Amino acid sequence: MNLRLDNVSKTYRVGSFGRGRLTAVRDVSFEVREGEVFSLIGESGSGKSTIGRMILRLLQPTAGSITYGDTDIASLHRRALKEYYRNVQGVFQDPFSSYNPIFKADRIFGMARTEFFPEVSGDEWRQRLHAALESVGLNPGDVLHKYPHQLSGGQLQRLLVARALLLDIRFLVADEIISMLDASTRIDVLNLLADLKARGLGVLFITHDLSLGNYISDKTVILRHGSIVEMGETEKVFGDPRHPYTQMLLASVPRLHAKWNGGTRARDLPETADLPPLIEIESGHLAAV
């Protein structure tokens, strides 16, 4: 099954007494398939994390729909919602925020067993748990009896991925998950995401880093002020960018595309609300031009 967004928007009430409106995401549509890495790339405030949180049901869209398979996730409750979370999980930029600091790692995994696998025996659960930890490069004896503050950021990220694997997920929302990690750990986590793809999982990779998006993703969406300005197969978006904003972003990373240096500046670009609709440049490549 695939994850699909159709004309999704998110507007917040802001200002005194909520009289103002701020549109964080505007009319966004795309589909993430199992077995592919799909990158959302944009600067701070582009709406990429808001999209990830809506997919995880942490936020509700103001308009549009998000479907998993044929089901609108807004309609899910109780058992159906629990099953959705068996298939779709998220890992965020700050791994410490996902843990209760007073619980050791084994207690955190124990709660996952109680919630999702109460019928599994203790011995079988330990076998599954150890296999999941080892599959993400962790030694169970080194991490299970430690508190979150005793583990590194990279270890905590891997624990979250191991928990997701225990649930037998089909999609992972990875929101800026390597931005706080050192260089060697970043490589390890990127390799882990590539391994998840090889297992047939879909990964929504949310990042502001064009180099990482280019390196890891099969398809790419470029966001500006909550709207899609360009979308398609990564090699086409990066190899032949059509929207001036995409060209400007690539020009800021010379090792990606030094040829996109025509002098376009952010202040020269139209506001996203004035963008024309996306048109298909060629098969697998759309841009708002």
Per-region residue spans from a language model:
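Conserved ABC transporter NBD signature motif
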Residues: G64-D72
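Charged, flexible cofactor/metal-binding loops and thiol motifs
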Residues: E233-V289
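ABC ATPase NBD coupling module
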Residues: S16-R19, I73-Q89, E115, V237-P241
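The feature captures the beta-strand-to-loop junction immediately N-terminal to the Walker
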Residues: I41-E43
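A short, surface-exposed alpha-helical micro-motif characterized by mixed small hydrophobic
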Residues: G213-Y215
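Conserved ABC ATPase signature
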Residues: Y147-L151, Q155
